[in-house]
Amino acid sequence: MTRDQAREKVIFALDSSEFAHVQYWAETLSDRVGMFKVGKQLFTACGPATVRMIQKFGGEVFLDLKFHDIPNTVAMASLEAARLGVKLFNLHALGGYEMMARTVEALDKEFKGGERAKVLAVTILTSSTEETLRQVGIESPVEEMVVRLATLARKAGIDGVVASPREIPLIREACGPDFLIVTPGVRPAFAALNDQKRVMTPAEAVRAGGDYLVIGRPIGDAPDPAGAAEMILDEIMAG
């Protein structure tokens, strides 16, 4: 794997609500990561201008808003996300088949088969455990729910999923090699686990078949963020 190929796999999570931070990170990391993740906090605070700022510096965007509502509302919100020119955005697979299928239908109609944002379905959050699921009435094991939701998403026409790296082999077996897998459960050897339970190192996640790796605090909290990003690329390349 080349360094450019490794770089394309890394998505830096912008864990901030300050617009000035967006410009700083876009300038600092645009040549060291493949994409920037804009989540709920940042997008709520700063809006679409966040996406445009990243694009101004040549960066690609993963809009991580995890849409989950009635089908028409999610489809219309998804159109607005795609019109911003983001590369990836997501919704919750727990919203069901109709919600996901209506979203894909709306996007295909809008973009008429041309290039558009890829839609990802969130399966089970990486902070969740089987006890967490039982507390909300889901008795199935985490792995079983992940595969069930990923399969449902693929059937609805969704482009891929967001899932823990430890579920990658199960998803690959159920959904095939062309189904995108984006994993936030990644921590390099030099970083603490924080609040995510089901994790792997970047090299392990890539070996397992992950297409994109979402990494935030191990880069953003490092004394030398650019250096931390380079260390992660080194680890991916070393395999």
Curated annotation (Swiss-Prot):
Name a GO molecular-function annotation.
orotidine-5'-phosphate decarboxylase activity
Entry-linked InterPro entries: Aldolase_TIM, OMPdecase, OMPdecase_AS, OMPdecase_bac, OMPdeCOase_dom, RibuloseP-bd_barrel
CDD domains noted in UniProt: OMP_decarboxylase_like
Q: Which UniProt keywords apply?
A: Decarboxylase, Lyase, Pyrimidine biosynthesis
Q: Please give the pathway this protein is involved in.
A: Pyrimidine metabolism; UMP biosynthesis via de novo pathway; UMP from orotate: step 2/2
Please list the residues that make up the active site. 66 (proton donor)
Q: State what protein this is by name.
A: Orotidine 5'-phosphate decarboxylase
Q: Its function?
A: Catalyzes the decarboxylation of orotidine 5'-monophosphate (OMP) to uridine 5'-monophosphate (UMP).
Instruction: Tell me the residue numbers annotated for binding substrate.
Output: 15, 37, 64-73, 126, 187, 196, 216-217
Q: Which GO terms describe its biological process?
A: 'de novo' pyrimidine nucleobase biosynthetic process; 'de novo' UMP biosynthetic process
Q: Which Pfam families match?
A: OMPdecase
List the GO cellular component terms: cytosol
Supply the SUPFAM superfamilies for this chain: Ribulose-phoshate binding barrel
Record-stated family: Belongs to the OMP decarboxylase family. Type 1 subfamily.
Q: What class of enzyme is it?
A: lyase
Q: In its keyword annotation, does this UniProt entry include Lyase?
A: yes
According to its UniProt record, the EC number is 4.1.1.23
The gene from which this protein is expressed is pyrF
Description of how the protein assembles with itself and partners: Homodimer.
PROSITE patterns reported for this sequence = OMPDECASE
PANTHER family named in the record: OROTIDINE 5'-PHOSPHATE DECARBOXYLASE (PTHR32119:SF2)
Q: Does the keyword Lipid biosynthesis apply?
A: no
Q: Which reaction does it catalyse?
A: orotidine 5'-phosphate + H(+) = UMP + CO2
